[in-house]
Amino acid sequence: MRIGTFVLAMSLALSTTASLAKPVTLSGDALRQAISGKTVFLKISGFELPINYAANGRMSGKMSAVAASFARGDGAQDRGKWWVADDKLCQQWSSWMNGKSYCYRLSREGATVYWVRSDGRSGTARIG
């Protein structure tokens, strides 16, 4: 009985500790390492948009057929470039987002990445 009580108490303590964890801000080299050579799955309007961030600073994205139908003519796929500046992930697509460059502050909590764009727009993603 004491072992069962101990296990229950430890489970509650660990779950409480996990729920108190705060997102860790990704910056500088940690941000670069988290993104470089990885695929980030951006959650947009109920869909996941995979964006591949190559180590050479190039990136590519491809929407699913369903997501592309909602893209209002922006195209199902695009390429661009990415870089880290002032502890933010910056990127510029060839045609998506009208080819404008935007920078994002990223923080990570477990498998979830929270992003806030320079204009205040925010959302979530996961790194695969």
Regions found by a protein language model. Give the residues of each.
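Bacterial N-terminal signal peptides
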Residues: V7-S15
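Lipid interaction determinants
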Residues: T17-R79, K88-G128
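Bacterial N-terminal signal peptides that target proteins for export
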Residues: M1-V7
